[in-house]
Structure formats: C-alpha cells, structure tokens
C-alpha cells in the first residue's frame, strides 16, 4: 500500500494527465477514455482553430472529475470491464456555440451520408433538416415543419394501404387457403409488404430526433480519434457506391415487376387499349388485387396505388441500405485504427502510445453501443423482412407451373437480388465485429520493450467487450449469424416443398 500511495503522489506532483487507476469500474471506462485524452484534444483543437477560446463541455469538468479519480487505490486485481456509452456521451460536444475547422471535413460520416439522406427524404424517410450542412450542430428535428408534415402524410397513406391489405388477409386466410397452391402468398403478401413499409417509416420517424443527437456524438468521436493525427477513412465514395448499387438494382427489379404485372397490356400505338389508363388498370388488377377486392377500381385509386407502391418499394430497399451505410462508417473507423496500431508494432517503436490507442478503441466501442441502441429496431425489421420475402419468392417459384419467359426472368432476378442484398447487409454489418478483433494478433506479438500494463488493458478491452450491432439484442450480426440465417432459409425452403 505504501508503494501504491507513493506512486500516486509522484504522478500528482508531475501533473500527469494519465494518472487514472487501472482498477476503474466498468461504468467509468468510457469516462476514463475522455479524461486521459484531454491534453491531446486541447492541443489539436487549438491548432485547428486558434481563434476560438471555447472548450468542449467535458474539459470544463476536468478538474473535478480528476480529483474524484485520484481517490481510488492503485490495484491490478480488478481489470477494467467493457466500456459503456453513457459516460462517454455525457461529455460529447452538444454546445451549439462550439466551432472547429474539422467540422467541415467532407469525409466525416455526417457529410458523407447527407446526400443519400436527402434522396430518402423525397420518399418520406427520416425528416431531419440540415443533413447537408457541414456540421451536425446545424441539424434539427422540428415537429411542426414541412419535412415532418410530408413524411407524416406518406406514412398515413401507406398505413391506409396496409389496413386494406390486412382486411383482405383476414377475409381470405382460412382452411381453404392452405389447400390452394399459392393461396397463402396471395393472402399475405400485400399485408406483409405494406405492413413492413409502414413499420419502416414509423421507425425512421422515431429515429429522427435521436439521429440528430447520434450524429453529434459521432462527430465528437471522430474529432476525438482524429486529434491523434490518424489517417481518416474515405467514406464518401464507399457510401455512394453502396447506395447507388443497391438502389439501381432495386429500380431494375421493380421495372421487371411492373412489366410482369402489365404483361397483358397492348403496347401497340394504334390499338384502342394502348392508353395509360388501360395500362394502369391492368397493372393494379394484377399487382394489387387484394386492394380491389375491398375497394372498387377507379382512375384516382389506380394513381394512388401506383404512386404509393413506389414509395413503399423505396422504403423496403432503403432499410437495408441505411444499415449498410451506418455499419460501413463504423467498420472503416476500426479499420483505420487497426492499421495505425499494426504499423506501430511492425516498426518496433520503443515508445508506443498504448494508452491513447486504448482510449480510441474505448471511444469507438461506446459509439457502436450508442448506434446499436438507436437503430436496433431497424436492423431487426430489415432481417425479418429479408427472411420473409426470400421465402415468399421461393413459394411463388414453386407454386407456378406455367410461367412465361418474362415471369422466369423476373423470378430469378428478384430472387438473386434479395439473396444478394441480404448477404451484403450481413457481411457489411458483421465487419464491425471482425475489425474489432483484427488487431489482437499484433498486440499478442508486440515486442517486450513496448509491452506494458496499458497494452494488457487494451487486450482485455478487445477480448472481453462484444462489439457488434444487434437486432434488439435478439441476435448479434457476425459471420456466424450469416450461416445461421442461411440455414433458416434452407429449412424454410424444404418446409415449403412439403
């Protein structure tokens, strides 16, 4: 104990910032990460913007928090637990007067995902203003605004379609339905499609005010890690490639769907039936028969069905795209951090800032947990939706005995697109878990001259903290989950055949 108090006194006299104890309780791990890096944040922030004299809110509380930390005893018997999100984000920069040149970084996640979110807002998704502003401090969710009213109107329209679909399902789903080939799919497909899209719009509406806070916390994490002059990930082209590829394939798949449902339309110019009204009626009767069983067809209803189906289709595809982009933003941060650690260990540097690396990994771990708490319902909806519609496509393919060439092209194209989209969202999301463990071999093999107690703490953090996005904690998205998901679909396929 005498040595412990002597060591603590020596650190106090030297004024060291990293005088925190090793035996921090788990609930203090994230706060520990912010405390230890205060000096580095001040230096980097002053270099980026010398004109501002303002500080992050957590720097103002630095002295009081440091005094509380000094009261703990030095001990190695209680290693630190995995970080939690609350302490870290309590000190995030929510001060609206804070400004920094790094806020204008075009490769920040907020700036990279902004244009994609603007496209989504045309379809009533995530009504948050300021998504194209250079800093998330300019973002806000206003309850009474045009964006909110527009999104609520689209959600209400999809809700009406979902109610009509559910009424049809209740009327037609009976014992005879199970005996008819393809009867279950005909009875439930409309209700499941519009019900899924309605839930997606509601969840994005629920996420909107949380998205503002999440983006500010995300930017705080980026500045926290970037203050170490670490290489930043190039996010813009990755997010653009993911969104444009998936949405382009979705457009092709939907065009094939329209062509299949309007196959009986006479496209000859001289024909009496070669009109848009005739095309619209044929399309609605084939694709939305479950609606027309409840409501008589007219041109206005046909236009409503045609427009709402496009809005719902976008939401159906964007749910997966959104999860992919968020997961890519986190995984790329881990990738850059791992690269920097591996470069340091491979060069056998005598002085490696293991404490700084541990703080960065702790901050990133906190960010993953914060993201998971906000988008977990959307992840659950995404995977449940993919599972159902893949099984539905299998059922439709096995039920139809006489198919045209266009039907076969649409079936195989749609099925391949669904499976590919599901595999892609699983692989991209599981990268977070993969990247969080990727640096461990380099830590195990680091030289004895660079290995210290901070290295051990970092190893403990990475091995014990489970870093992954989840579906409301029902499942964690890892590569093993993809195998389990594939086995589930394979089982459903055989059940459908029986």
Task: Identify what each model region corresponds to.
Residues 2-27, 37-43, 47-432, 449, ...:
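Membrane-embedded alpha-helical segments and the immediately adjacent membrane-proximal loops
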Residues 432-454:
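C-terminal hydrophobic structural anchor segments
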Residues 456, 460:
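Long, aromatic- and glycine/proline-rich binding clefts that accommodate carbohydrate-like moieties
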């Amino acid at each position: 104990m005498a040595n412990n108090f002597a060591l603590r006194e020596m650190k106090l006299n030297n004024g060291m910032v990293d005088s925190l104890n090793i035996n921090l309780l788990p609930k203090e791990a994230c706060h520990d990460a912010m405390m230890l890096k205060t000096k580095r944040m001040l230096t980097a922030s002053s270099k980026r913007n010398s004109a501002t004299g303002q500080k992050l809110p957590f720097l103002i509380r630095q002295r009081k928090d440091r005094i509380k930390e000094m009261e703990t005893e030095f001990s190695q018997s209680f290693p630190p637990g995995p970080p939690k999100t609350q302490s870290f984000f309590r000190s995030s920069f929510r001060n609206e007067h804070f400004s920094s040149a790094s806020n204008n970084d075009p490769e920040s996640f907020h700036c990279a995902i902004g244009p994609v979110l603007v496209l989504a807002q045309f379809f009533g998704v995530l009504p948050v203003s300021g998504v194209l502003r250079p800093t998330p401090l300019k973002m806000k969710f206003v309850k009474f605004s045009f964006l909110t009213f527009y999104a609520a109107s689209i959600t209400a329209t999809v809700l009406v379609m979902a109610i009509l679909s559910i009424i049809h399902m209740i009327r037609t789903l009976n014992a005879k339905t199970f005996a008819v080939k393809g009867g279950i799919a005909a009875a439930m497909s409309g209700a499941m499609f519009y019900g899924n899209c309605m839930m997606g719009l509601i969840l994005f509406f629920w996420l909107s005010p949380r998205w503002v806070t999440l983006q500010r916390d995300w930017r705080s994490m980026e500045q926290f890690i970037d203050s170490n002059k670490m290489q930043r990930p190039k996010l813009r082209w990755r997010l653009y490639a993911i969104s444009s590829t998936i949405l382009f394939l979705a457009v092709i798949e939907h065009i094939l769907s329209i062509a299949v449902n309007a196959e009986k339309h006479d496209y000859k110019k001289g024909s009496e039936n070669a009109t848009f009204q005739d095309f619209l009626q044929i399309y609605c009767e084939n694709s939305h028969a479950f609606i027309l069983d409840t409501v008589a067809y007219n041109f206005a209803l046909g236009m409503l069905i045609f427009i709402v189906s496009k809005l719902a289709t976008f939401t159906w595809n964007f749910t997966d795209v959104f999860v992919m982009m968020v997961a890519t933003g986190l995984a790329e941060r881990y990738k850059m951090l791992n690269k920097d650690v591996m470069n340091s260990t491979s060069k056998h540097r005598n002085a490696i800032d293991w404490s700084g690396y541990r703080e960065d990994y702790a901050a990133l771990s906190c960010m993953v947990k914060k993201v998971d708490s906000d988008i977990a319902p959307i992840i659950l909806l995404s995977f449940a939706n993919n599972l159902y519609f893949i099984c539905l496509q299998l059922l439709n393919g096995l039920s139809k005995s006489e198919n045209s060439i266009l039907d076969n092209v649409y079936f195989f194209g749609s099925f391949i697109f669904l499976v590919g989209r599901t595999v892609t969202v699983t692989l991209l999301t599981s990268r977070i878990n993969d990247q969080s463990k990727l640096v461990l071999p380099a830590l195990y093999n680091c030289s004895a001259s660079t290995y210290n107690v901070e290295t051990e703490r970092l190893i403990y953090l990475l091995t014990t903290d489970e870093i992954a996005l989840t579906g409301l904690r029902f499942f964690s998205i890892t590569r093993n989950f993809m195998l389990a998901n594939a086995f589930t679909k394979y089982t459903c396929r055989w059940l459908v055949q029986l």
